[in-house]
């Protein structure tokens, strides 16, 4: 198109269609902006393959342009620092890349002058609700508006990622007396011993807190906390020093950062504070290092260190009152005593006629038993894990076990273990059987495999009827024990059953009915021919295909004022890719079977060309229609409509097309019967012809 005046020309990189932005190359083309204001020609933007070409590749009608955006960004690597603007038309968005900021501003200014575009008023708000893609900073600004308006627009138009963030003041500048902080700095925390002049409430702190198990939790002290608005009468002066609320309602001191011993420890073993400090401390019981023996302090340190979280009131442990302090001091060397006390047997019977091996055993740990009742171990007795136990230790153990009182100690085990035991006496008999065999009485004979082939058969009591299975592994014991008397004693440790065969691995007997074969994985079979899984080929999602340059904080949009410049009707030559003519075709009736169109007429719109409006595409269809008409020549009823349709397709008369849009049922049935009759006659003719030739 050479009728218009050339306003601007130069090299620009053009984007492919929106659905091919990332897969197709951005071609460098020679663009020419023409204005038909003086010549009467339409305003167009043409681009050529090079600056010497005479025929444009495409003509963009600026009358269809709706908006121009300048200062876009694209997340493609080669366009990180590019100057991108777009021309938004009715049919497509053209993204153009300029070589410099000046070129981009020049093109945008010229296009806006021709189209009559002005900066949009709602543009400063658009970046806040625009695309979800995060825009990147652009190294340029638009100079189509005054500098003052640009500064004002840029200050208002910045989305949240680009706004200046006002940092809050440093925590050091804020006084702690304003509001309690969520976090405390370790710089402001101090840890020291209580002073004599401190309040009665603070004197209840244990003096060993800075050297015992609470070294990792500093005792927070802040001098400014005395001015807190929460301080009523000086009694709650240290409420601000802790980052979590106190553990009890009546306690607001810093004792929440220390480990609070349960109430049960303070009955007979712990030396209490003065009554005044105990009342001030509420439910908390503490003790000081100077008062009390070294054995008690050592025992309590073991207790406090071994718990990460204080137990609930229903799960506290009771220490037997008959144990002397020396016994506690000796037993404090055992690491497993505070956590897992050994199981408790019933009252011991005279043991003069039993051997040491049959009458006594070392208490078992938590991994060997799940009983809900335990007794403390004898003083000075450590759980031996060897295969032999001296007679002296066994006698001492039996003596201590028979002379001490036993107390029930609830244990924090899962409910499925403890709830399954009904009676203590029957339960303990079951425990002794489980320790020896691991199964009920009905299953002992069929599941038991003796370790020693020469051992006599097993003898068991008839009271073992409840089928309970040991969750941990249970060793097989030789059949030399008297189970009727053995059930009344402390169960032997796990290693006692392997004295005759220490190399035999442990075996857990399971009923045959409970055994299920593992599932068979056929895919593990060697040389198995399996059909490969179908390839999961997914088309690119829409957001990946339509990923386009996005708006940045300095993007400016220009659009036409609809009141001053109404949109003109869409011309027919908007989709032309090879046209250089500005003439418009007023024919709006689309006839796909017309062989005279789109071959010589270059102004055919895209829908005609896309549907095959050229003469090479129409010729096969025309032959097909002629062949179809030849099939109906024998029927006089259907011939006139077929002739009318043939002539109508060539003359493109609207009334003849309407006759074929409305379907007549009688005519359709008549046409069908005629076609079937002709087909039968033709087939019979073709079958007779070869026979005549053969004769």
UniProtKB/Swiss-Prot annotation:
Official protein name in the record: GRB2-associated-binding protein 1
Sites of Phosphoserine modification: 251, 253, 266, 304, 403, 455, 652, 684
Classification via InterPro entries: Gab1-4-like, PH-like_dom_sf, PH_domain
One cellular component (GO) term of this entry: cytosol
Family membership: Belongs to the GAB family.
Residues recorded as bearing N-acetylserine in the entry: 2
Keywords tagged on the record: Acetylation, Phosphoprotein
Biological process terms in GO annotation: cellular response to vascular endothelial growth factor stimulus; epidermal growth factor receptor signaling pathway; epidermis development; heart development; interleukin-6-mediated signaling pathway; labyrinthine layer development; MAPK cascade; platelet-derived growth factor receptor signaling pathway
Subunit structure: Identified in a complex containing FRS2, GRB2, GAB1, PIK3R1 and SOS1. Forms a tripartite complex containing GAB1, METTL13 and SPRY2. Within the complex interacts with METTL13. Interacts with GRB2 and with other SH2-containing proteins. Interacts with phosphorylated LAT2. Interacts with PTPRJ. Interacts (phosphorylated) with PTPN11. Interacts with HCK.
Any one GO molecular function term: signaling adaptor activity
Tissue expression notes: Expressed in the inner ear (at protein level). Expression is detected in the cochlear duct, spiral limbus region, efferent and afferent nerves, and in spiral ganglion neurons (at protein level).
UniProt biased composition (Polar residues): 206-229, 314-334, 457-466, 605-617, 686-695
All residue ranges annotated as the PH domain in the record: 5-116
Its biological purpose: Adapter protein that plays a role in intracellular signaling cascades triggered by activated receptor-type kinases. Plays a role in FGFR1 signaling. Probably involved in signaling by the epidermal growth factor receptor (EGFR) and the insulin receptor (INSR). Involved in the MET/HGF-signaling pathway.
Residues bearing the modification Phosphothreonine: 388, 639
UniProt region (Disordered), positions on chain: 204-229, 306-387, 453-659, 671-695
PTM notes: Phosphorylated on tyrosine residue(s) by the epidermal growth factor receptor (EGFR) and the insulin receptor (INSR). Tyrosine phosphorylation of GAB1 mediates interaction with several proteins that contain SH2 domains. Phosphorylated on tyrosine residues by HCK upon IL6 signaling. Phosphorylated in response to FGFR1 activation.
Gene: Gab1
Modified residues (Phosphotyrosine): 628, 660
Biased composition (Basic and acidic residues): 673-685
Organism: Mus musculus
